[in-house]
Amino acid sequence: MFRIVNGEDYSPAVQQRNSLDFGKAPSLLWTDNGGSNDRCETGGNGRESGQDRVKRPMNAFIVWSRDQRRKVALENPQMQNSEISKRLGYDWKMLTEAEKQPFFEEAQRLRAMHRDKYPGYKYRPRRKAKRPQKLLPADSSVLCSRMHIEETLYPFTYKDGCAKATRSRMESRLSYSQPTNTTSSLLPQEHRSSWTSLSHNRVT
């Protein structure tokens, strides 16, 4: 069967709208077999979002802290969750081994049930996503300055790790130029004093 294609379907505006809609919708992988309607939806980012992640079995502290956390939260409604966790950790350390023993036994039972339910389970911790480094604005990343040394402009730039080297280099230039400037500034005074003494001798 042939389908009549409208010429407007290939206009630049329609093509741009279709490309944008394709980027927003989840990607669909179709099989090459034309008679099959099977498809696999991968999601917008390509990750397996439909599968539930298997949780680890609770340890003795988690078993004990479930009821204790609820109790502390009811007694102190204004207390933050982080403060509750610190308090529970301190209270757990203060318990004796005999007081902890029932919770270790319960955790062992839960671990056995988890092993029977998920025989091939392996704990894989989630890797923390690397945060992109914040880019400094152009004004702060590259600081250009100009200094006037012996009637000459020397531009220099502070950038990344070269700031210290550039600063020391400019300080060395300054220290080198100071005697010259001092000498040049003293020259008019010497000429003035010699001219004054010469004129005084002529008068006498």
Swiss-Prot record:
The keyword DNA-binding applies. SMART domains: HMG. GO terms for cellular component: cytoplasm; nuclear speck; nucleus. Its main location: nucleus. It holds the Pfam family HMG_box. Residues 30-52, 171-204 are annotated as: Disordered. Residues 54-122 bind DNA. Residues 174-187, 194-204 have a biased composition (Polar residues). Gene3D superfamilies: High mobility group box domain. It is found in: Nucleus speckle; Cytoplasm; Nucleus. Acetylation of Lys-130 contributes to its nuclear localization and enhances its interaction with KPNB1. Deacetylated by HDAC3. It comes from the Eukaryota. One of its GO terms (molecular function) is DNA-binding transcription activator activity, RNA polymerase II-specific. One of its GO terms (biological process) is sex differentiation. Keywords: Acetylation, Activator, Calmodulin-binding, Cytoplasm, Differentiation, DNA-binding, Nucleus, Repressor, Sexual differentiation, Transcription, Transcription regulation. Interacts with CALM, EP300, HDAC3, KPNB1, ZNF208 isoform KRAB-O, PARP1, SLC9A3R2 and WT1. The interaction with EP300 modulates its DNA-binding activity. The interaction with KPNB1 is sensitive to dissociation by Ran in the GTP-bound form. Interaction with PARP1 impaired its DNA-binding activity. Transcriptional regulator that controls a genetic switch in male development. It is necessary and sufficient for initiating male sex determination by directing the development of supporting cell precursors (pre-Sertoli cells) as Sertoli rather than granulosa cells. Involved in different aspects of gene regulation including promoter activation or repression. Binds to the DNA consensus sequence 5'-[AT]AACAA[AT]-3'. SRY HMG box recognizes DNA by partial intercalation in the minor groove and promotes DNA bending. Also involved in pre-mRNA splicing. Belongs to the SRY family. PANTHER family: SEX-DETERMINING REGION Y PROTEIN (PTHR10270:SF161), SOX TRANSCRIPTION FACTOR (PTHR10270). This is Sex-determining region Y protein. It comes from Balaenoptera bonaerensis (Antarctic minke whale). The gene is SRY.
